Design a protein with these regions (language model features):
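Mid-domain Rossmann-like dinucleotide-binding core that forms the NAD(H)/NADP(H) cofactor-binding site
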Residues: 84, 128-204
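Short, glycine/polar-rich helix-capping loops at beta-to-alpha or helix-loop-helix junctions
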Residues: 104, 182-189, 254-259
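N-terminal Rossmann-like NAD(P) cofactor-binding module of classical short-chain dehydrogenase/reductase
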Residues: 154, 222-223, 245
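Glycine-rich beta-strand-centered segment in the early N-terminal region that forms part
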Residues: 25-43, 54-96
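C-terminal hydrophobic helical "lid"/dimerization subdomain
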Residues: 2-3, 281-332
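Short amphipathic alpha-helix with an adjacent loop that forms part of the alpha/beta core around
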Residues: 206-216
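Glycine-rich phosphate-binding loop and adjacent beta-alpha segment
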Residues: 173, 229-299, 331-332
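NAD(P)H dinucleotide-binding glycine-rich loop of Rossmann-like/cofactor-binding domains
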Residues: 82, 91-157
Length: 332
């Protein structure tokens, strides 16, 4: 193995072009860490926001980036059983900081508690397309929302990897998904992925369609990463005593709180991220739930497009185009 490796870092915040390949000494894992020889990277919207300096974590220059990698463990630090060397694993978002352990690179050093095995039937590309989407959806819909058979669940940004995961979880739990997308271009694919209903907001009134689908009852759960002005419409479409999960802030404008609607219907409007789930005692149960459904084939990571490692800037640009349905993956 070479004494140096290529690691993607950025030395200032900004557009995709700030990402650069830095040739660095091969890093050694510290106590309770492992090193992966990376085979695939799964991109997430959080990494775009981090690169832009608009994320929950502030970049420390020069900063690493990347939450999700799949690969083979080739070294272990102190306090980690060496029998893990040679095993195929993927990294789990929410268990480490991007500044400390960002995984964009030929190798990645991450905490031992930040890895997980996945079914051997999955490819490296699929292995890098699991934990952010399914854990995020599980935490809101199952852990906190307690989705039940027959519930109506509104899923905005439904063509994202998290949105697709939410569709799958809603289906296996016997609930009914109402997926929201801006244009008709993605409607057919969302239906193919298992959406029960699709609302195209450029052509249809969101509140009217939800009321039509639910026979006027509204949705018990709303799962939204957008915020902004759509929150008022989502509140209007939510059933009395329903819950709205805000798990992102994709809208560039402020998010007004729909006070009167919330008061009138006793709504819960709740902020949530995967970082709330990962330290909780339910975390192992969440991972097992996801593993089991991946193994059974009920969950199947949808990969929209793959890029080579040298094209990671193009991969970031593609994510920002919002053309994808599912996961964008970088292969090494």
């Amino acid at each position: 193995m070479s004494n140096t490796v290529k690691i993607v870092r950025f030395h200032k915040t900004g557009p995709a072009e700030v990402l650069q390949f830095d040739e660095l000494p091969l890093p050694e894992p510290g106590p309770n860490e492992v090193r992966l020889r990376v085979k695939a990277l799964g991109l997430n919207r959080a990494e775009i926001m981090f690169r832009n300096g608009q994320y929950l974590e502030t970049p420390v220059s020069p900063s690493k980036n990347g939450y999700e990698a799949a690969g083979i463990i080739d070294a272990t630090g102190a306090d980690v059983d060496t029998s893990w060397v040679g095993k195929t694993v993927s990294t789990v978002p929410g268990t480490f900081k991007l500044n400390d352990h960002g995984v964009y690179g030929e190798v990645a050093v991450v905490p031992f508690h930040g890895i997980a095995e996945y079914p051997s039937t999955l490819s490296y590309e699929q292995g890098a397309s699991i934990w952010m989407q399914y854990l995020t959806a599980y935490g809101a819909l199952i852990w906190l929302g307690q989705v039940a058979k027959g519930d109506f669940v509104v899923i905005t940004a439904a063509s994202s990897s998290v949105g697709i995961a939410a569709i799958e979880i809603v289906k296996v739990e016997g609930a009914i998904s109402i997926c929201v997308t801006r244009t008709a271009a993605k409607k057919a694919e969302l239906l193919k992925q298992g959406a029960d209903h699709v609302i195209v907001t450029d052509e249809e009134d969101l509140v009217a369609r939800v009321n039509e689908i639910t026979s006027g009852k509204g949705a018990r759960i709303v799962f939204d990463p957008i915020g902004g002005k759509i929150l008022e419409s989502l509140a209007a479409a939510t059933a009395p005593k329903g819950i709205i999960f805000e798990y992102g802030a994709l809208a560039p404008e402020p998010t007004p709180y729909p006070l009167f609607t919330a008061l009138a219907k006793y709504l819960t409007i709740r902020a949530y991220t995967v970082f709330e789930l990962t330290p909780d005692p339910v975390f192992p149960k969440a991972k097992q739930y996801i593993f089991d459904h991946l193994a059974s084939g009920a969950f199947k990571p949808l990969i929209d497009k793959t890029f080579h490692f040298a094209e990671i800037v193009d991969a970031h640009r593609y994510m920002e185009s919002n053309a994808q349905i599912g996961k964008i993956v970088v292969i090494l």
